């Protein structure tokens, strides 16, 4: 069973359907006790950083999410679910993130020929932290975002993407995996990535 966090700002049904297509059941919840008891956890997200982290805190979900990550059980963040893991985001002001990873989230500042938001299919380049993800450099995933993460520790960068310059497309640290792109919208390669998450061994800390 995979648990998907509901804080009213994620494309929950499409994530749930993608999980179920990998042959694993998925539940959607905003209940802290269910999050704490989860076997595997997905934090999705679509929208603005400040609104999202505000909803997480308003619903008292910050501690159970951080405790889950610390437990060593498999965790997947998607889009805003990646960005909120960092210390600060600057979308519509300065907002404190979950602080699970050091670094911040900043806006694209690109030449006029590059449209923002970065929307559509783009290729990724695999780094050392992503070597065991079963992804090859040049694989395309679907992106929709105007901000990107800047990890303080470069060793957590699993995948990068080039859009007017290189940016972090995914991070990996132990049981934690998070992507800027949407695997649930990325057809076969995205579904394979989700299946890999759904079947990853659980190593509880």
From Swiss-Prot:
InterPro entries registered for this protein in UniProt: Class_I_gatase-like (IPR029062), GATASE (IPR017926), Imidazole-glycPsynth_HisH (IPR010139)
Alphabetical keyword list: Amino-acid biosynthesis, Cytoplasm, Glutamine amidotransferase, Histidine biosynthesis, Hydrolase, Lyase
Subcellular location: Cytoplasm
Positions of the catalytic residues: 79 (nucleophile), 182, 184
One Gene Ontology MF term: imidazoleglycerol-phosphate synthase activity
The keyword Amino-acid biosynthesis is assigned to this record: yes
EC number: 4.3.2.10, 3.5.1.2
TM region positions: none
Primary localization class, coarse: cytoplasm
Reactions that this protein is recorded to catalyse: 5-[(5-phospho-1-deoxy-D-ribulos-1-ylimino)methylamino]-1-(5-phospho-beta-D-ribosyl)imidazole-4-carboxamide + L-glutamine = D-erythro-1-(imidazol-4-yl)glycerol 3-phosphate + 5-amino-1-(5-phospho-beta-D-ribosyl)imidazole-4-carboxamide + L-glutamate + H(+); L-glutamine + H2O = L-glutamate + NH4(+)
Biological role: IGPS catalyzes the conversion of PRFAR and glutamine to IGP, AICAR and glutamate. The HisH subunit catalyzes the hydrolysis of glutamine to glutamate and ammonia as part of the synthesis of IGP and AICAR. The resulting ammonia molecule is channeled to the active site of HisF.
Self-association and partners: Heterodimer of HisH and HisF.
Protein name: Imidazole glycerol phosphate synthase subunit HisH
Gene that this sequence comes from: hisH
């Amino acid at each position: 069973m995979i648990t998907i966090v509901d804080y009213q700002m994620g494309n929950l049904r499409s994530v749930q359907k993608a999980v179920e297509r990998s042959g694993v059941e998925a539940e959607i919840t905003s209940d802290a006790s269910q999050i704490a008891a989860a076997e595997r956890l997905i934090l999705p997200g679509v929208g603005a950083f400040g609104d999202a982290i505000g909803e997480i805190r308003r619903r008292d979900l910050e501690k159970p999410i951080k405790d889950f990550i610390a437990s060593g059980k498999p965790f997947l963040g998607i889009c805003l679910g990646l960005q909120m893991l960092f210390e600060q985001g600057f979308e519509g002001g300065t907002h404190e993130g979950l602080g699970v990873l050091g670094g911040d989230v900043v806006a694209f500042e690109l030449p006029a020929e590059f449209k923002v938001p970065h929307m559509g299919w783009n290729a990724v380049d695999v780094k050392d932290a992503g070597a065991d993800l079963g992804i090859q450099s040049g694989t395309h995933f679907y992106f929709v975002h105007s901000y990107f993460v800047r990890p303080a520790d470069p060793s957590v960068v699993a995948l990068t993407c080039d859009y007017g310059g290189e940016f972090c497309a995914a991070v990996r640290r132990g049981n934690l995996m998070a992507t800027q792109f949407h695997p649930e919208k990325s057809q076969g390669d995205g579904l394979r990535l989700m299946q890999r998450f759904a079947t990853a061994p659980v190593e509880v800390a």
